[in-house]
C-alpha cells in the first residue's frame, strides 16, 4: 500500500542481492503513470491515481517484453509536478545474472505483469505494520504511520503540502481496499517495514 516503504525496501534488497553476486536494477512503477490528461477521475471529478487504469500498462508491457528478449529500453521518469513522463536518457538492458526489482502499489496486480511467466517473478508484499500501542486497549492504526510517511514524502518530492495529502488520503485508502489488499495473498513473502522509533523521528518533518 501507499508509503509502506516500497522504494526504500527495493534499494535495500538491491544491496543484498549485489552482495550475493547478482546485478539488481530497481525500477519504480510510479514512472509508468499515464500523463495527467489521461488520468481517470473518480465519482467526485478528482484524479484517481490509485486505480490500475492510471498506469500506462501498454508501455510497461512493451518494455518488459523487450527486456526479457534482451533488448535495451529507455526508462521514463514521471514528473509529478508537470504530470507527464519525461525521458532523460536513462537506458536499461538485462543480461545473465541481472535482476529487475520492480516496485509500486500495483506490482502484485495480475494486470501489471500480464504475459510474464510466473517462474520469472518473485512477489513481495510490503506494509508498515506499526506495533506500538497507546495503552493496553488502544493501538495506533497502521494507516496512521503510513499517512505521516506520505505527508513527508509528498512535501519533499511531489510538491504537495500536508493539507493536499490529507485531502487525498480517503481516495488513497479506497484504492488500497479495491486494488491492493485483494492481491496481498498472491505474494511469495511479506515484509514489515515499520520501525519502532520512526514516528518520533518523522513527526518533526510532518
Please place each PLM-identified region on the residue numbering.
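Post-Walker A helix-loop "phosphate-sensing" segment adjacent to the P-loop in P-loop NTPases
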Residues: 15-25
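Hydrophobic positions on the alpha1 helix immediately C-terminal to the Walker A/P-loop
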Residues: 9-13, 28
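Conserved lysine of the Walker
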Residues: 6
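Conserved NTP phosphate-binding and transfer environment spanning the P-loop NTPase/kinase superfamily
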Residues: 110-206
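Structured core elements
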Residues: 25-28, 50, 100-102, 123-125, ...
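Walker A (P-loop) phosphate-binding loop of P-loop NTPases
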Residues: 3
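Conserved nucleotide-sensing/catalytic segment adjacent to the nucleotide-binding pocket
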Residues: 25-27, 34-83, 99
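Glycine-rich phosphate-binding loop used to anchor ATP phosphates in small-molecule kinases
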Residues: 61-119, 169-183
